[in-house]
């Protein structure tokens, strides 16, 4: 599983042209899924990172607070392009990502796991929808997570 994390002041998402979900301050997490990601070990590792990363400023201006410390939310959005391979040619290959049906199930399972265990409000996008996302980035702070710890 790969996740791009962005610290946001607010985010709103439309799916297939219709308003779908919104959130105030917190983390917007773009989630890419590969085969084999649908297990509790992966879910626990990634969710623990998401809710405990200290990327929000404390009273001294130091990034020392998590969404749990701040009472902020988590917004999960599926994004298959995180497994795009641009090393050869000019069109990315997405063969490293999980097949659509498997990815859909893993995303829904991860979303349910996050809602049950995050300790924070969890918002979401709609899997395989055409989504328009309006964000107000804070910082900007953008980080990468990989369950295989490649980076």
Spans of model-derived segments:
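N-terminal, polar/charged subdomain of small-to-medium soluble alpha/beta proteins
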Residues: 1-93, 101, 105-151
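An anionic oxygen-ligand recognition environment, strongly enriched in 2H phosphoesterase
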Residues: 96
């Amino acid at each position: 599983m790969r996740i791009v994390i962005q610290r946001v002041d607010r985010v709103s998402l439309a799916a297939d042209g219709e308003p779908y979900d919104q959130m105030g301050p917190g983390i917007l997490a773009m989630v890419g899924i590969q085969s084999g990601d649908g297990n509790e070990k992966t879910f626990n590792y990634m969710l623990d990172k998401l809710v405990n990363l200290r990327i929000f400023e404390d009273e001294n201006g130091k990034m020392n607070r998590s969404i749990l410390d701040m009472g902020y939310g988590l917004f999960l959005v599926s994004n298959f392009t995180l497994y795009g391979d641009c090393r050869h040619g000019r069109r990315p290959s997405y063969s490293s990502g999980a097949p659509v049906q498997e990815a859909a199930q893993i995303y829904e399972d991860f979303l349910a796991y996050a809602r049950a265990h995050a300790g924070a409000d969890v918002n979401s996008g709609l899997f395989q929808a055409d989504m328009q996302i309006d964000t107000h980035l804070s910082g900007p702070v953008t980080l990468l997570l990989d369950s295989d710890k490649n980076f």
